[in-house]
Amino acid sequence: MKDYVVKATAYDGEVRAIALRATEMVKEACKRQGTWPTASAALGRTMMGGALMASMLKGKDKLTVRIQGNGPIGEIIVDAHASGATRGTVTNPHVSPELNSKGKLDVARVVGTEGTLSVVKDLGMKEPFTGSVPIVSGEIGDDFTYYFANSEQTPSSVGVGVLVNPDESVLAAGGFVIQLLPGAKEATITEIEKRIGETPPISKLVEQGKTPEEIINGLLGEENVKFLETKPVFFECSCSKERIGNAIISLGTKEIEAMITEDGGAETVCHFCNESYSFTEAELKALLEEAESKR
């Protein structure tokens, strides 16, 4: 089954609903990062939170999510585009705490319970939109829920989950966001809260083969839902040799000269996809000329 996100409204426009299946997207990101199981869950949950949020954007709009907690995983960074392209990285992929009291991967322990979740949205305007909230649990779904309520003033429920195989590969990954729109009735809110409380973990639903549409129908009641749009979500890294070259130019002439005289070349690795880029001495000299022309 392919990864995709579906958007819907429900209860005659009182509610916005978005759900996604992202197993392959998360699997590819975790493979490239070399994450151990709990880090896979943390990275996957953050990527899906970013992808759900990015599905509300348009055109070439994009956003970056940063979770900076006090746990051993360090920083989690996710870039997500309106197109569905998403990538992510963690500072320390090799964290492996014991299971929590429920026998589950202890994401809160690796993320930490103190710190910030921040979102920067590039909407093609002069200045990006930036919002930041304190981490409330470190479980990530709760933290996105708190972000929507406090930074965007939209009461929401966010569920994101990742199941990991015994061989440490990703078995299933999925997520949803349910948002109350202005004018939502108390009766609607009560019914949705009850339904969400009775819903199995999202990762289990994906493992069982439930589609994003079926997940939304289960959360809100098929008779209440109107589907609007589906589009793919996928792992994609925007790095390239040209971009890395521009980054080297931005270091300045002294740094480039040192690369030439001391190392006779340069090699750099993308933090997101682990692709390696090599620059020969001749290529560095060309970059040096370009850097000098910009002084």
Curated annotation (Swiss-Prot):
GO biological process: protein refolding
Disulfide bonds: C237-C239, C270-C273
Main location group: cytoplasm
Keyword Ribonucleoprotein included in the entry's annotation: no
GO molecular function terms attached to this record: protein folding chaperone; unfolded protein binding
Protein localization: Cytoplasm
UniProt PTM comment: Under oxidizing conditions two disulfide bonds are formed involving the reactive cysteines. Under reducing conditions zinc is bound to the reactive cysteines and the protein is inactive.
Stored Pfam families: HSP33 (PF01430)
Entry's Gene Ontology cellular component terms: cytoplasm
CDD domains, alphabetized: Hsp33
UniProt keyword annotations, A-Z: Chaperone, Cytoplasm, Disulfide bond, Redox-active center, Zinc
Sequence similarity: Belongs to the HSP33 family.
Matching PANTHER family: 33 KDA CHAPERONIN
Biological role stated in the UniProt entry: Redox regulated molecular chaperone. Protects both thermally unfolding and oxidatively damaged proteins from irreversible aggregation. Plays an important role in the bacterial defense system toward oxidative stress.
Protein name per UniProt: 33 kDa chaperonin
Species whose genome carries this gene: Shouchella clausii (strain KSM-K16) (Alkalihalobacillus clausii)
